Amino acid sequence: ENFMQGIYDKINYIAYSATTQEELCYGEKGVYEEGYFSRERELKRQMVRLFNSFYVDDLQIYAKNGKDYYFSVKQEVKKPEKEEIAKMIQQATDAMGGIVCINDLKHSGHLQIVKEVRDNLKMSPIGTIRLSINSDALEQIRKNVNFASEGAVLILDEKNQIVQGQASELS
């Protein structure tokens, strides 16, 4: 629980930061700002600082203005298809700014976390953040839980399907 809360806090930090807000509101598609102190470069540095973890495989921010910001910890990360991304963005939109966890372990091997970013002043949607956590990280979290007696940890998705752990541990 602490791990996921930490991830949620980082996502919220990026979503509400002044740099993200300005870039998602005023950035222009097809325009790359080269200056070290440009909003785009500052946003990318912020993404690297907050998510350089072996738990996180990639982080992507989709702006309503058409710009796309991507950061990956690994070289060979399988990015979701456009249809999957559209579905995730719709789920984030339906949550109206809330954080949504999507079980995508069977397809991509990741737990996808999405959040709709809203303008701090107008509360209108300006983009979506997508973060993927690899299944190895979930297994490591599950194994690190220690009980004083017999016990096991299962990680379930929103439909109570087992994400990590064995069904035999339920008995």
Name each model-derived stretch.
Residues 28-33, 75-78:
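Short glycine-enriched, charge-decorated loop/helix-capping segments at active-site entrances
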Residues 31-42:
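Signal-transducing coiled-coil linker helices
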Residues 22-24, 62, 67-74, 160-167:
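Amphipathic coiled-coil signal-relay and dimerization helices
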Residues 1-28:
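Juxtamembrane extracytoplasmic/periplasmic/luminal helical "stalk" adjacent to the first N-terminal
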Residues 40-51, 55, 122-170:
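Solvent-exposed, extracytoplasmic
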Residues 80-84, 142, 171:
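A short, polar/proline- and glycine-enriched secondary-structure boundary/capping micro-motif
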Residues 16, 59-66, 152-161:
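Short hydrophobic alpha-helical segments used for membrane anchoring or interfacial signaling
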Residues 52-132:
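Extracytoplasmic/periplasmic ligand-binding sensor regions of membrane-associated signaling proteins
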